[in-house]
From Swiss-Prot:
InterPro entries in the record: GPAT/DHAPAT, GPAT/DHAPAT_C, GPAT/DHAPAT_LPLAT, GPAT_PlsB, Plipid/glycerol_acylTrfase
Gene Ontology BP term (one): fatty acid metabolic process
EC top class, as a word: transferase
Species, as recorded: Shewanella frigidimarina (strain NCIMB 400)
Record pathway: Phospholipid metabolism; CDP-diacylglycerol biosynthesis; CDP-diacylglycerol from sn-glycerol 3-phosphate: step 1/3
Protein name according to UniProt: Glycerol-3-phosphate acyltransferase
Membrane spanning stretches: none
Motif (HXXXXD motif): 308-313
Catalysed reaction equations from the record: sn-glycerol 3-phosphate + an acyl-CoA = a 1-acyl-sn-glycero-3-phosphate + CoA
EC assignment: 2.3.1.15
Entry's localization field: Cell inner membrane
HAMAP family: Glyc3P_acyltrans
Length: 807
């Protein structure tokens, strides 16, 4: 290696400084990797390269890491800071032998046998000049920009054309002390370490670039040869009384409508545009859990991203985040309604494949789509689809659509060798661009068809949207899931591959529910969602600022002390900084008088702000239910609280996709927290501390409308136990409308017919419908629900039910 202060290297570094723009993965190696700044460190690279080391030098300087040009001094010995697996590839002739680098490994290991206290950290570093995966059919471009083993001339061409798209990826540090203690220090271990390192670099490249891209027409030709599509073409020909060739042309049209046409060039251009867009829209994007997903990719998993659907921005945000986190943007299942010019062609080139809202029994379309999805999985492309099927208008997760999940499981059953893993993703925003439109649609206005004019209209309204949130939830390995649901599934399929197993549909439904549960398990309690939650629980949607800040501090402490799950995230800062942030976004109104400052929700947008509250209401459901018990019982013991929570939790779980493994333990942790915070006194019998009564009342109010719904349902069941599901749903909806009109309830979800359908399904499952067996339980839950309501609301419900069904 040339000396770092040589004229050549100084000139090279100066040139690269102007030509190269580098993105580091992960963004903070000290934070995200187990690098210990107190221990000696050596970088491991795949190929010796002057330009790569120059680029690495710029990065290490910025992070305060040792320079690759600075040798490691150990007890009088000088060791190179960089160890490479391969020498430089000359323009002509063979590459330099790797023996020199193997000797470096051996010498590093042997140092540990001589010095028991020594622990050198070996940090693998990968550099990528551009991220083109290449085509399955080789081309001149691939020859010129050969990225795996470039000569110095090819490397200069890569820097010239792709220098603005340089990625440097650091991996977890490997302890050579651990290697030496566990495996020894001889040359055999150095050989093994070299082999492992080669596999690591090969996998890292695939994670960063993805599999090679197929020629689109060659892909179509391959798919048309599949048995399922050939059979569907023959059936189409027979059923529609057209020629086989005509049916084949229809299949090609379907493929052309569906298939993505991924372009790395467009992705690079889009990356520049999206960087500008995010910087204009958002003050930051908060990411949690990306490292676990990167590891799944590295371990060879087929990844299927299943995010919640808040906004059309979701398509762009997740792909952008994955790109910057060193992973390939997925192929995204987009609704056919988005296939309009110019967005459709751009989405398609960015990896979108289009799906119709309904297959309408079209067997040929179904066969083509399934085979295309199978091909994506078989070739190793990451896939993304929205299990809700559409954007939520209320801020709550929608009931999942199971079609894509069923096709994914079918692909596993058809014999994908790699593990297939679903990665739930929570997407959140301080401002959703379409939220005002959602309010209009919920009020009865017809949904507008997507068009280029809507895009221009949205761009015109761009402003300060605060922050975005991308949290990756608990992954679901499909092979493991199937092993749990049907341990003999492989044997069953081997006996009769064409027979749909009896366990298939129940398993798909369970999987869909688990996906939604894991999405909510990764929720982000942000400044806007928390403030909306507090203010909408207050009378007139307004609080004195210091009171609001205290309530926010309480919720922040609760969510951090008793975390909902390890995947959820909580806003940084305190109540004051959160209120300041929300006011800077013009989300709330600040009014000052002689006494102080009042923060409120503008009555014109109160319904709109319920959208943000609903994003995280499940996080506070149990604390709020516990607070409600404490408010409505003069003295409330631990046993009573447990009993009431266990009565309502099955309904809360079904309605809010909640995921608490040990509910009694979670309840105890919340009670202990409330005692520690001084809100309550007692250890088994609790009373609210008088000076904290307002905080407990506000907390209890969060779930009040939910309890009102349950009171409606159980009062109906108590007075008429033989109600059918359809009758219960109809009458519950009718009484909810009446209650809302009398008591000013405006939240859209309060009147949502689909919500009452979800609850009726759960009640049927629990045995509470059309059965006298559980009548005592129904009466008990009705009494508990009534007790947790204000006297006026309770009386309205009781009187209305008796008027409707009284004898």
């Amino acid at each position: 290696m040339s000396k770092p202060d040589s004229i050549f290297l100084r000139a090279l570094r100066w040139i690269q400084k102007w030509m190269v723009q580098t993105i580091v993965v992960p963004h903070d190696p000290f934070d995200d990797l187990n690098i210990d700044p107190t221990k000696p460190l050596v970088y491991l690279m795949k190929t010796e390269s002057i330009s790569d080391i120059a680029a690495l030098s710029e990065i290490t300087e910025g992070f305060g890491l040792p320079s690759p040009y600075e040798p490691l001094q150990l007890d009088g010995l000088t060791v190179p800071r960089v160890v490479c697996l391969e020498g430089r590839k000359p323009l002509f002739g063979k590459r330099e032998s790797g023996d020199k680098f193997l000797n470096y490994f051996t010498s590093l290991l042997s140092l540990h046998s001589e010095s028991p206290e020594l622990d050198i950290q070996l940090v693998p570093v990968c550099l990528y000049w551009g991220r083109t995966p290449g085509k399955e059919e080789d081309s001149m471009k691939a020859a010129v920009f050969e990225r795996e083993n470039p000569t110095w001339l090819r490397k200069w061409l890569m820097i010239l054309f792709l220098g603005r798209h340089n990625f440097v990826q650091f991996s977890n540090a490997l302890s050579l002390r651990h290697m030496a203690d566990e495996h020894g220090t001889d040359k055999r271990i150095a050989h093994k370490l070299t082999r492992v390192a080669r596999v690591h670099f090969r996998r890292q490249r695939k994670v960063m670039t993805g599999p090679q891209l197929p020629n689109r027409q060659a892909l179509f030709a391959s798919l048309l040869k599949s048995e399922s599509i050939k059979k569907a073409i023959e059936e189409e020909s027979a059923n529609k009384k057209v020629t086989v060739e005509k049916a084949r042309e229809t299949a090609i049209e379907y493929l052309d409508e569906i298939a993505a046409d991924y372009s790395d060039s467009l992705v690079r251009i889009a990356e520049r545009f999206l960087t500008w867009l995010w910087n204009k829209l958002y003050s930051g994007i908060n990411i949690k859990g990306a490292e676990q997903v990167r590891q799944l990719h590295h371990d060879g998993h087929e990844i299927v991203y299943v995010p919640c659907h808040r906004s059309h921005m979701d398509y762009l945000l997740l792909s952008y985040i994955l790109y910057y986190q060193g992973m390939v943007p997925p192929h995204i299942a987009a609704g056919i309604n988005l296939n309009f010019w110019p967005a459709g062609p751009m989405f398609r080139r960015g990896g979108a494949f289009f799906i119709r809202r309904s297959f309408n029994g079209n067997k040929l379309y179904t066969a083509v789509f399934r085979e295309y999805l199978d091909q994506l999985f078989a070739k190793g492309y990451a896939v993304e689809y929205f299990t809700e099927g559409g954007r939520s208008r209320t801020g709550r997760l929608l009931a999942p659509k199971t079609g894509m999940l069923a096709m994914t499981i079918n692909s596993v059953l058809r014999g994908i060798e790699r593990p297939v893993t679903l990665v739930p993703v929570y997407l959140g925003y301080d401002h959703v661009m379409e939220v005002a439109t959602y309010h209009k649609e919920l009020s009865g206005k017809k949904k507008k068809k997507e068009s280029v004019w809507q895009v221009f209209g949205a761009i015109r309204k761009l402003g300060n949207f605060g922050q975005g949130y991308v949290n990756f939830g608990e992954p679901i390995n499909l092979q493991q899931f199937l092993n749990q649901q049907a341990p003999e599934w492989r044997d069953e399929l081997a006996k009769d591959p064409d027979q749909k197993p009896s366990w298939f549909t129940p398993s798909v439904n369970l999987l869909a529910n688990r996906v939604m549960t894991n999405i909510n398990g990764a929720a982000a309690a942000s400044s806007v969602t928390l403030t909306s939650l507090v203010l909408l629980a207050s009378e007139q949607n307004a609080l004195e600022r210091s009171q609001l800040e205290r309530q926010l501090d309480l919720y922040l402490a609760l969510l951090k002390t008793v975390p909902y799950t390890e995947y959820a995230s909580v806003a940084e800062g305190n109540g004051k900084s959160i209120v300041d942030h929300c006011l800077s976004l013009n989300k709330f109104v600040s009014t000052k008088d002689l006494i102080g400052e009042i923060i409120s929700v503008d009555e014109k947008i109160a319904i709109t702000m319920s959208y943000y509250r609903n994003n995280i209401i499940h996080l506070m459901a149990l604390p709020s239910l516990i607070a409600s018990c404490l408010v409505h019982y003069d003295v409330c013991d631990r046993q009573r609280i447990h009993a009431i929570v266990m009565d309502f939790y099955p309904l809360l779980k079904a309605e809010l996709f909640m995921s608490i493994d040990d509910v009694p333990k979670h309840v105890d942790c919340i009670l202990d927290f409330m005692v520690e915070q001084g809100l309550l006194t007692g250890s088994d019998q609790f009373e609210i501390t008088p000076r904290h009564i307002t905080q407990v009342l506000l907390l209890a109010e969060t779930i009040s409308e939910t309890l009102q719904r349950y009171a409606i349902i159980f009062n109906l069941l108590a007075i008429k136990p033989d109600l059918e599901r359809s009758e219960l749903e109809r009458d519950s909806h009718l009484l909810a409308q009446r209650l809302g009109a009398l008591h000013g309830i405006t939240a859209p979800e309060f009147y949502d017919k689909k919500l009452y359908n979800t609850l009726s399904v759960k009640l049927k499952e629990l045995g509470y419908l059309c059965s006298d067996e559980h009548r005592a339980e129904v009466i008990r839950i009705r009494d508990n629900a009534n007790k947790l309501l204000s006297s006026l609301v309770r009386q309205t419900i009781v009187d209305s039910v008796e008027a409707e069904h009284g004898q």
